[in-house]
Amino acid sequence: ETADMDQPRGVRVAYASGYSRVAVTIAAPEDAVSIRRMFPDAFIIAVHTTGITDQEALMLADHADIVTSCASRAVREIAGRKALLQAGSSIPVFAMTRKAKDLILDKVKSTDGQFLVTGAKLPSESDFGPQPLV
């Protein structure tokens, strides 16, 4: 057998096994589109986005719940503008859906410690992020 990563197949197996709350990390934007089409309730987290194209960033913004920015210019510019919430500034994580926004805010509420919450036009930039963005 091979050790290939097939995220849509993994989500299909999870639902077929009786799981009703399924989350998946994806690195290929096409997987986000495929999974969202087949399983609208799946929670999709896009990772490893450095170097993706503008079109791929748009696919993630339209189909993933959370998009990590890594060192991606396209994610910051495209997903960042469409995001409902941005967590972090050096390596932003963008909540693209209401359930992603709620998840991040619930994590903040349940965590001890201090947080800065401010309103801003997204994406909000930091002087400490990776350079260059690709």
Residue ranges and their predicted role:
Residues E1-V134:
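Conserved mixed alpha/beta catalytic, RNA-binding, or beta-rich assembly cores of soluble enzyme
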